[in-house]
Amino acid sequence: MALGLRCFRLVHPAFCNSLAALTRPVSEVTLQTVRGRQNDHGQCMAYAAVPVRHFATKKAKAKGKGQSQTRMNLNTALVEDIINLEEVDEEMKSVIEALKDNFNKTVNIRTSPGALDNITVVTADGKLPLNQISQISMKSPQLILVNMASFPECTAAAIKAIRESGMNLNPEVEGTLIRVPIPKVTREHREMLVKLAKQNTNKAKDSLRKVRTNAINKVKKSKDKASEDTIRLIEKQISQMADDTVAELDRHLAVKTKELLG
């Protein structure tokens, strides 16, 4: 009996440490030192790490800010074998950056020469930005000049593109020189810019949908690499990332709208 109790006392610490390790997140490496009473030497027990990536669920989003969120645990190694979510995230972020750049260049109360740079002109050689086929300069605070001397054959197409840019511009032509009067800052002009901002935001959302669709299609093609539950979980995560990006696009639109309307 005494021998049995002694053995139990020796085994008990290691047994408890093992149980404690099982209750910890699988993403941690648990290293416990078991103090043996036999020679007072430390013995180490290591548990292998399993990489895990944590994501918030839509249900968690609905709880509101400042509250604890339920997290989805995705095995990083398993997910990366199917799709690189970080690359998908970068593509979605690039959509946001493109919209912000668009707002800064083309959706401003005061029209500047830079606002005309990326107006797309349909030419015989394809679609080209206006600044590649012309010289754009500021004649005065009320007038922008677009010199088409290098590509005179594109003058008519350039005028059409400027007029249809959505920036409320009415170009006038003198030979190969296009004069673009800068519109006065009226309430109507502000509202037209808001409309343009919404159009550009919708285009950004279209680009985002393409990123989401391409990512999900890639996941669907990997059904032989993972279970249906894993595939479905990854698809939900991609959709959630897209939803978060849409919310960010809407936030930038709201800020821009407030700026334009004063």
Curated annotation (Swiss-Prot):
The entry assigns this protein to a family as follows:
Belongs to the RRF family.
Q: Where is the transit peptide?
A: 1-55
| Top-level taxon of origin | Eukaryota
Cellular localization per UniProt: Mitochondrion
Q: Return the Gene3D superfamilies for the record.
A: 3.30.1360.40, Ribosome-recycling factor (1.10.132.20)
Example of a GO MF term: ribosomal large subunit binding
Which SUPFAM superfamilies does the record match to this protein?
A: Ribosome recycling factor, RRF
Q: Which GO terms describe its biological process?
A: ribosome disassembly; translation
Q: Which UniProt keywords apply?
A: Mitochondrion, Protein biosynthesis, Transit peptide
Q: What is this protein called?
A: Ribosome-recycling factor, mitochondrial
Q: What does this protein do?
A: Responsible for the disassembly of ribosomes from messenger RNA at the termination of mitochondrial protein biosynthesis. Acts in collaboration with GFM2. Promotes mitochondrial ribosome recycling by dissolution of intersubunit contacts.
Write down any Gene Ontology CC term: mitochondrion
